[in-house]
From Swiss-Prot:
Belongs to the GHMP kinase family. IspE subfamily. Catalyzes the phosphorylation of the position 2 hydroxy group of 4-diphosphocytidyl-2C-methyl-D-erythritol. NCBIfam families: ispE (TIGR00154). The lineage of its organism: Bacteria, Bacillati, Bacillota, Bacilli, Bacillales. SUPFAM superfamilies: GHMP Kinase, C-terminal domain, Ribosomal protein S5 domain 2-like. The active site is at K9, D135. Pfam families: GHMP_kinases_C (PF08544), GHMP_kinases_N (PF00288). Gene3D superfamilies: 3.30.230.10, GHMP kinase, C-terminal domain (3.30.70.890). It is an enzyme of class 2 (transferase). It catalyses: 4-CDP-2-C-methyl-D-erythritol + ATP = 4-CDP-2-C-methyl-D-erythritol 2-phosphate + ADP + H(+). GO terms for biological process: terpenoid biosynthetic process. ATP binds at P93, V94, S95, A96, G97, L98, A99, G100, G101, S102, A103. This is Putative 4-diphosphocytidyl-2-C-methyl-D-erythritol kinase. The keyword Transferase applies.
Amino acid sequence: MIYETAPAKINFTLDTLFKRNDGYHEIEMIMTTVDLNDRLTFHKRKDRKIVVEIEHNYVPSNHKNLAYRAAQLFIEQYQLKQGVTISIDKEIPVSAGLAGGSADAAATLRGLNRLFDIGASLEELALLGSKIGTDIPFCIYNKTALCTGRGEKIEFLNKPPSAWVILAKPNLGISSPDIFKLINLDKRYDVHTKMCYEALENRDYQQLCQSLSNRLEPISVSKHPQIDKLKNNMLKSGADGALMSGSGPTVYGLARKESQAKNIYNAVNGCCNEVYLVRLLG
């Protein structure tokens, strides 16, 4: 048996630069991880089946699950003769902008690499994972990074300054492809990636909070105004900075002090079913 944790990610910044010939957007984003984790265990099987065990019936256990597809890809890549049972203890909200599915897929690639003693490097696993998900390369490493291209080009950055993170997911799901289809590249939107990069270089917490920006946020807010209300609630309740992560709908707030973080948590806990008080990992 092999055990892996799969931490959630948040975006400090997210920008889309242009539409590529392959249909994807060229992106530029800075991401980090928080200590909200899915936990996965892996067992070899005597047959060649891939079995995903998960308690939540709203999470698929077939080829629609990224962990299943990662296992399928890994077994094909390394021509394995055995299947695997993957048990997922899910804590990261689904369709939330926190890369829960990608984190599980990355954990699966790392876990199977150990389970079958393949000895592949993290770089090799990241390249393999990029075939099925743009956030998977980042999730292979779980380090604060600037991600460009489709997300597969990674430059590691300093860990962010220590801070509390309040995550709040409204009771709705958002499809990332649907949001990306609505991007208007002719419409100006300032994303402060350079400012964020410098803030992390200098471990400047205040500058980091000022740099939080996401080009997808106004698009998701136009469809779901409660996202903006949630963000404003966090800021009014004392968050040093707040932002929608990914394509949403999860909003997070940053706080240096535990008492400050608990105040924000209590302020938003009544309006969202899923609220978490966690720490930055990076």
